[in-house]
Amino acid sequence: MKPDAHQVKQFLLNLQDTICQQLSAVDGAEFVEDSWLREAGGGGRSRVLRNGGVFEQAGVNFSHVHGEVMPASATAHRPELAGRSFEAMGVSLVVHPHNPYVPTSHANVRFFIAEKPGAEPVWWFGGGFDLTPFYGFEEDAIHWHRTARDLCQPFGEDVYPRYKKWCDEYFYLKHRNEQRGIGGLFFDDLNTPDFDHCFAFMQAVGKGYTNAYLPIVERRKTMAYGERERNFQLYRRGRYVEFNLVWDRGTLFGLQTGGRTESILMSMPPLVRWEYDYQPKDGSPEAALNEFIKVRDWV
């Protein structure tokens, strides 16, 4: 089947609705929607929940942008795209909970298509989800990765290990020599064997995110914590900011294409702190995180 951008867009709009409803049901607060248009073509719906019962900030963004020329960040690793018009659409979300025992989570599913007269369209899907705990619980990590593995299973035995490895490699802070979290799934440039197969996989990832995340939220959201745990959470959020501004391809793509800055930076935590040469005490739960986030097979 030929790529059907309209069908993908409808799925993404529905996915944004569903995820917002599911997060609101857990939190008790509602998302506020901000619709926007992009001068160069396209627009989107940004939805933010702030200072809820469970989530300090949750942002779920839908965007659909198009233009006559592909930006440098996209053509750098796909030189054949130079000179083509493009459409890019996706849902991207980040959830920053109040409670330091509830991990931060991120998910994204997206579709690109680039066309020029007289040539076959170039298209691909990308996306994934990843988890960033501040305090590690093995049962949470196992559940997260088991959910990821199970949704990959119908698409082939090698799919989960391949996209888990890619996720571990992608969400890595080279300047810190550490992982951002415990990973999950990451895929990009997916366009084989055909459109229907790739679209079905992207849908499975989009729908699988809340199955992976919400049981962990329910398990941890009422755990007691104090100033020490909160300070550590804010300190570790700094790594999130560093990754997004220095290494994340999606952030760079959005800023280079004249995307909406407020929506692109919606992934930022509302509060964060840095501390010069911070070293957690040996044997403390905070020190244990360094070991917990190292790459391993969780399932």
UniProtKB/Swiss-Prot annotation:
<feature type="binding site">
    <location>
        <position position="92"/>
    </location>
    <ligand>
        <name>substrate</name>
    </ligand>
</feature>
<dbReference type="GO" id="GO:0042803">
    <property type="term" value="F:protein homodimerization activity"/>
</dbReference>
<feature type="active site" description="Proton donor">
    <location>
        <position position="106"/>
    </location>
</feature>
<dbReference type="GO" id="GO:0006782">
    <property type="term" value="P:protoporphyrinogen IX biosynthetic process"/>
</dbReference>
<keyword id="KW-0479">Metal-binding</keyword>
<feature type="binding site">
    <location>
        <position position="175"/>
    </location>
    <ligand>
        <name>Mn(2+)</name>
    </ligand>
</feature>
<dbReference type="Pfam" id="PF01218">
    <property type="entry name" value="Coprogen_oxidas"/>
</dbReference>
<protein>
    <recommendedName>
        <fullName>Oxygen-dependent coproporphyrinogen-III oxidase</fullName>
        <ecNumber>1.3.3.3</ecNumber>
    </recommendedName>
</protein>
<dbReference type="InterPro" id="IPR018375">
    <property type="entry name" value="Coprogen_oxidase_CS"/>
</dbReference>
<comment type="pathway">
    <text>Porphyrin-containing compound metabolism; protoporphyrin-IX biosynthesis; protoporphyrinogen-IX from coproporphyrinogen-III (O2 route): step 1/1.</text>
</comment>
<dbReference type="InterPro" id="IPR001260">
    <property type="entry name" value="Coprogen_oxidase_aer"/>
</dbReference>
<feature type="binding site">
    <location>
        <position position="145"/>
    </location>
    <ligand>
        <name>Mn(2+)</name>
    </ligand>
</feature>
<keyword id="KW-0963">Cytoplasm</keyword>
<keyword id="KW-0560">Oxidoreductase</keyword>
<feature type="binding site">
    <location>
        <position position="106"/>
    </location>
    <ligand>
        <name>Mn(2+)</name>
    </ligand>
</feature>
<dbReference type="GO" id="GO:0030145">
    <property type="term" value="F:manganese ion binding"/>
</dbReference>
<feature type="site" description="Important for dimerization">
    <location>
        <position position="175"/>
    </location>
</feature>
<feature type="binding site">
    <location>
        <position position="96"/>
    </location>
    <ligand>
        <name>Mn(2+)</name>
    </ligand>
</feature>
<keyword id="KW-0350">Heme biosynthesis</keyword>
<dbReference type="GO" id="GO:0004109">
    <property type="term" value="F:coproporphyrinogen oxidase activity"/>
</dbReference>
<comment type="subunit">
    <text>Homodimer.</text>
</comment>
<keyword id="KW-0627">Porphyrin biosynthesis</keyword>
<feature type="binding site">
    <location>
        <begin position="108"/>
        <end position="110"/>
    </location>
    <ligand>
        <name>substrate</name>
    </ligand>
</feature>
<keyword id="KW-0464">Manganese</keyword>
<comment type="similarity">
    <text>Belongs to the aerobic coproporphyrinogen-III oxidase family.</text>
</comment>
<dbReference type="GO" id="GO:0005737">
    <property type="term" value="C:cytoplasm"/>
</dbReference>
<comment type="function">
    <text>Involved in the heme biosynthesis. Catalyzes the aerobic oxidative decarboxylation of propionate groups of rings A and B of coproporphyrinogen-III to yield the vinyl groups in protoporphyrinogen-IX.</text>
</comment>
<dbReference type="InterPro" id="IPR036406">
    <property type="entry name" value="Coprogen_oxidase_aer_sf"/>
</dbReference>
<feature type="region of interest" description="Important for dimerization">
    <location>
        <begin position="240"/>
        <end position="275"/>
    </location>
</feature>
<feature type="binding site">
    <location>
        <begin position="258"/>
        <end position="260"/>
    </location>
    <ligand>
        <name>substrate</name>
    </ligand>
</feature>
